Amino acid sequence: MNSVPQNTTIVLVHGAWADGSCWKDVILPLERNGVEAICAPVPLTSLTDDIVALTRVLERTSGPAVLVGHAYGGAVIGAIRDERVKSFVYVAALAPDEGETVAQVFYRDEPHAEAPKLNPDKHGFVWLPVDAFTRAVAHKASNEDTRIMSAVQRPISVQCIQEPAPAPGWKEKPSWFLLAEEDRMINPKTQQFMAARMGAKIRAARVDHSPMYTATNLVVDVILEAACKTLNSVNPSAQVAND
């Protein structure tokens, strides 16, 4: 694998029921490979709000960027049209086309038997029960991790999944897709459909919905591959060292 430019920024976008801490095991391995990694805290209040929040984070960076989205975060990164963004990485993520909603692609195929029912509260936000994290969100993760995931979960507004998506950047720029073959939240068939439609480079693996926790090395490798393939190398002699 080629080296990664020193001024590259990897921007990590969490999905629903999560915050930036879901990338905790990915950040340092990326930085040991010479790239800055930052998390974009999106509010999960509407797709538009989340796009604006990600745009603000991008304004803090300089140089080329690679956007990485997990689950719902894929819809957010796809809406960014900043010229400094060189590629997209989808980690078991959703990638609606222009005019589609997150809900339309999420429910394209039958949900897994262990997938939780998504019912909004009186404020229009969806929370997950505690056991949803051990049964579906990260069924291969440790009990400690799933307990923390449940405790820090942030609800997602129904507006996020009902708002039509704008024209996606993946139609113009290269994308990578980590397809989670044992995903219990987003049907792997749906992931395959989206990845093929995008023309993404697909990395399929027998991982669950949250490989940031359960297959960290794989996630880091896919991100670094996207960065190396789409950005000019500053130091051709440097080697990428996965951790």
Model-assigned labels for residue ranges:
Residues P5-T48, A65-V66:
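Conserved HGGG/HGGXW glycine-rich cap/lid loop of the alpha/beta-hydrolase fold
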Residues T48-A65:
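Conserved acidic catalytic loop of the alpha/beta-hydrolase fold
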